[in-house]
Amino acid sequence: MGFYNSPRIILDNLVLNLDAGNTKSYAGDVSSPAGTPYGYFTGGIVPGSPSESSISQRIDYDSDTTTTSPKGPLSASRRMHSGTGSNSYGYLAGQLPNNTNADRIDYSNDTATATSKASVLVDEANRRGAVGNNSYGYWSGGTPNTTKISRLDYSNDSGGGVLKGYLTQTRMGLAGTGNASYGYFGGGMSRTTMDRVDYSNDTPTASPKGPLTGQRYGVGAAGNANYGYWAAGYPENTIGTTIDRLDYASDTDTCLSKGNLTESKYWVTATGNQSYGYWAGGREQHDPGQSDFSYTSKIERIDYSNDTATASPKGPLAVVVREVGAVSSRANAIPTAGSPSTRSVTQTNGTPYGYWMGGANPDKS
């Protein structure tokens, strides 16, 4: 406790105004968390349906054992798409049917239909990977084969995307994750390597990194500020439960194998926050030659602080889907600290009196 420019008192960072004529006093600034504690799984193919869907399902990170909540929907049906975004909006792009548009989810109003944004990608492709920071989103790879990297400036998301650099090789069915400085595109059909985009210098060709412990496509990726995780994927029954971890501080090393998912699957998606990654959707894998390719509603959570353990089942999804996209305001180590806001508190005033006590009588001196 301390006194600063009386009549104010600073107590545990709370500023109290002792002016008896002011019943509302300044109570200091407080920073509210940026973004929302949710992840969104969007679109995909529903069992029994021959085409894409526009559904959006939200998982609450603070209550992740409950069934996902219906939100959205997207402005159009889509599958085989990928997402990234800021702490205000999530963007989904690169899909079937092929086009260059994206859907934007407003995290502060997620019951509304997503807003369509034109020409976010510089070329048409599906099965892309996506990654980004709080300012820009990057999409690359996919089929038809392309190495172009599209960048969207979130502050001008009606202006369309621009071409930025290239991957070192074509990739189909890849996944991306990263931190505030770098984005990593990993996997893809017949690919074990990764490509790293430097956000501070994003026009050169991406840098080869990794590799993963094995080839995989239809993979999902998520991570925090220090590590990226790639899990699930194809080939059948050889890679579908494996979790690979990339250490960003040593990103030329081969990924380390960590825990496992509880079931083998591919065409999954993933998102998360600083503590956990969530893998959702997909198609369960079976023995070669088996024709029953069932979908899964299970959401699997990787605990980054204990990543050698088997993933924990969460959710489930309210609607079973595969080939879905995912976004979250907590993904890719996006900052969670918001702008400071001013608080005030009501104080109880004293009485309008003053008192003098003690002292010496001058007649007695």
Regions found by a protein language model. Give the residues of each.
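Polar, enzyme-active/binding microenvironments
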Residues: 1-365
